[in-house]
């Protein structure tokens, strides 16, 4: 299902030196290969160990690497696909860069009191082996991979990848849970039909999801939408389906805590999927993306949105549209890594103090 670089740590007797040994593979993931579902997976992030940061090989938050979701409550999964991009490419490199920027993340969330690693079994499952030459085949591969993950009860947290990937993920999620609620945070509504004569690309995932009955349309909220358009009412389709559309200008200079209180009430206990495109944020904070739009959300508002989902029945999350070639400082990927950690902290069963 997932193509991984099989690896192991070897410690020389009495030397204290840890040697990285790897066999052939397609993806260079993280620290240690977790081959069983023992209590060792109930752990703080390995970033708490005594090794200095540059010594370790990169996985999300230095989590153990597993080739199977069996026994996990949640897992980080990379989908390095950008062949659905309409403007600037590069999101295929997003998972790798986000993992790199996650290495300094801690194990608890002092702001919310969340203790994810004391509550859940979590690992990094590596990357889905997409087909960069065939978008339709990539969608099939993603859908099948996520069906296997979800069938075990594991909640996937996805590192994208362009927003096309949300469509096959939602196909798998809906097969497991039925139509789901959606909190979509992004600059674009992504409800186009086929403006480029193709029904599947990063501007169409939620249109296709409605077509296939994957969403509970009365429980879909889109936040941060903005930008110029070729029509005066570019959000007509979303609103006609019952989506709540919260424009970026309605968020300017405001706390979004009251908005999220309304959304929590709207969602109730239904299964909820969170899809966060990094272009929701103003490009002053997140320049490394394929289709930036000015006057976006702030990082603190992004935190309010994700933290506002804590306690809801979250069944999956993604963070998409990070394009490292346009992220010279690494700040965009750093934001993405932190937002994924916040998503982990917002999952069901995560205890707080």
From Swiss-Prot:
The modification N6-succinyllysine is found at residue 218. GO terms for cellular component: mitochondrion. Residues 1-33 form a transit peptide. Its main location: mitochondrion. It catalyses: 3-guanidinopropanoate + H2O = urea + beta-alanine; 4-guanidinobutanoate + H2O = urea + 4-aminobutanoate; taurocyamine + H2O = urea + taurine; L-arginine + H2O = urea + L-ornithine. Residues 29-52 are annotated as: Disordered. Its EC number is 3.5.3.-, 3.5.3.1, 3.5.3.7, 3.5.3.17. The keyword Acetylation applies. This is Guanidino acid hydrolase, mitochondrial. The gene is Agmat.
């Amino acid at each position: 299902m997932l193509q991984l670089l099989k690896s192991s740590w070897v410690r020389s007797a009495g030397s204290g030196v840890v040697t990285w040994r790897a066999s052939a593979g397609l993806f260079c993931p993280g620290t240690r290969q977790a081959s069983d579902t023992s209590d060792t997976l109930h752990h703080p992030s390995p970033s708490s160990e005594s090794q200095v940061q540059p010594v370790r090989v990169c996985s999300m938050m230095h989590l153990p690497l597993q080739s199977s979701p069996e026994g996990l409550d949640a897992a980080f999964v990379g989908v390095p696909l950008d062949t659905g991009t309409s403007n600037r490419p590069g999101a295929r490199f997003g998972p790798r860069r986000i993992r790199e920027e996650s290495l300094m993340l801690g194990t608890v969330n002092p702001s919310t009191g969340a203790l994810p690693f004391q509550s859940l079994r979590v690992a990094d499952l590596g990357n889905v082996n997409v087909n960069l030459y065939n978008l339709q085949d990539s969608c099939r591969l993603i859908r099948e991979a996520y069906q296997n993950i979800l069938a075990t009860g594991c909640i996937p947290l996805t590192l994208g990848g362009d927003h096309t990937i949300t469509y096959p993920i939602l196909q798998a999620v809906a097969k497991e849970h039925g139509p789901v609620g959606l909190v979509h945070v992004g600059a674009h509504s992504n409800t186009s039909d086929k403006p480029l004569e193709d029904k599947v690309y990063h501007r169409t995932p939620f249109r296709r999801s409605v077509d296939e009955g994957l969403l509970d349309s009365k429980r879909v909220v889109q936040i941060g939408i903005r930008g110029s358009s070729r029509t005066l009412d570019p959000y007509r389709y979303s609103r006609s389906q019952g989506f709540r559309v919260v424009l970026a200008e309605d968020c300017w200079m405001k706390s979004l805590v009251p908005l999220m209180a309304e959304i929590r009430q709207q969602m109730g206990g239904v299964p909820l999927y969170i899809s966060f495109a990094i272009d929701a944020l103003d490009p002053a904070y997140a320049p490394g993306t394929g289709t930036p739009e000015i006057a976006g959300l702030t990082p603190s508002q992004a935190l309010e949105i994700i933290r506002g989902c804590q306690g809801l029945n979250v069944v999956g999350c993604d963070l998409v549209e990070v394009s490292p070639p346009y992220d010279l400082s690494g700040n965009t990927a750093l934001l993405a890594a932190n937002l994924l950690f916040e998503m982990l902290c917002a999952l069901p069963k995560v205890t707080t103090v």
